[in-house]
Regions:
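Conserved active-site segments centered on acidic
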Residues: 1-78, 142-151
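Short beta-strand scaffold positions
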Residues: 3, 83-84
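Helix N-cap/beta->alpha junction signal
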Residues: 12, 85-86
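Phosphate-binding/catalytic loops
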Residues: 80, 86-151
């Protein structure tokens, strides 16, 4: 599973950390690989945003060792490329030259919300981002387990 947002410092690392936590709780760490990337290189090598780190710490979820990186062509090897908003989907498909690939999709299209995950870089609302990421990750994990029953 690869989570993608613009800078890879707010939304996608939050989703990555939440998904890792859910996978660990279920004893699936050796079965499901999780990472995140950004379509922009503006923050490459940086730790997650302070607001992301603080919200996850408050919820008992670690961001230790996480560093942002830009999307690369080898990321097409992931089975699920989960983008935080419609712009991320478009840019990811262009960058990976995978315009019709159904494994690249908008995160909340898995949920009843069917909307973009608002970027807390602009909104300042890390709580909303956290809640949407938890819902999306839980739904995505159930989908993965349904599609890969042998896990």
């Amino acid at each position: 599973v690869l989570f993608v947002c613009l800078g890879n410092i707010c939304r996608s690392p939050m989703a990555e950390a939440i998904m890792r936590d859910l996978i660990e709780e279920r004893g699936l760490t050796s079965k499901i690989k999780v990472d995140s990337a950004g379509t922009s290189s503006a923050h490459a090598g940086e730790a997650p945003h302070k607001g992301t780190r603080e919200k996850l710490k408050e919820m008992g979820i670690s961001t230790s060792g996480m560093k942002s990186r830009q999307l690369r062509t080898t990321d097409l090897d992931f089975d699920y490329i989960v983008c935080m908003d419609a712009s991320n989907v478009k840019n990811t498909r262009e960058m990976l030259r995978a315009h019709d690939d159904t494994k690249i999709f908008r995160f909340l299209d898995l949920t009843p919300h069917k909307k973009d995950v608002p970027d807390p870089w602009y909104t300042g609302d890390f709580q909303e981002t956290y809640e949407l990421c938890v819902e999306g990750c839980e739904t995505l994990l159930e989908r993965i387990l349904e599609e890969h029953r042998n896990i």
